[in-house]
Amino acid sequence: MAKKPIDPKIAAELSRLALMPDDEIDTSDAPEVTDWNRAIRGRFSTVSLDERGYDVRAIANWILDYLSEMRINASNMSLNKLIYFIFERGLVERHILYTPARVEAWNHGPVFREVYHAVKDNDDKPISDRISRYSVRDREMVEAREQFSADDMDFFKSVIDDYKDFTAAELRRISHRDDGPWDRVWKSAAPVNPGMVISIELILASAPERRDLDGRY
């Protein structure tokens, strides 16, 4: 049977996507790959989560906008930590999963790969630009934005207000607290997963419901 020729517009779009740099590829909805060989399984969570489905890059841009209003700068490291604290507290305190993006345990704490790569050229300098994503509808890179609910924005503000005066190093230390989610993944001797993913189940099992601003609980 003869193959049906590909529409020229679709072929051109596929060629464009094939040339897209790895840093611009959205992997936020990629399934978590877990190798349980010699690993200790985490406690099974029976908590029902409300999934918002927000793009983590849009959350990052919202944080940058909010900090800018207060004339506060954010670096790559501090931005990733602030997103993580929203992610963690949303799960623990509200049973809300704000983004399907995976959080990973890196050397300097929890990191969202999409955000890190988008602003990595800033190194440790303040971030001035906003993060973009590829729009299938518009066929171009656009600024990552979401229509956040008023309630969610109020929650985001409450978390950022708790941590806005901390330095990046202090936020890193808080995220590294003993026996916390990052600590459990980073120090695990077993090959729990290749991507060092900090799973939702692990966060619910090891993160405290409330903690002091310095990370103690």
Predicted segments with their positions:
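Generic N-terminal leader/processing signal
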Residues: 1-2, 79
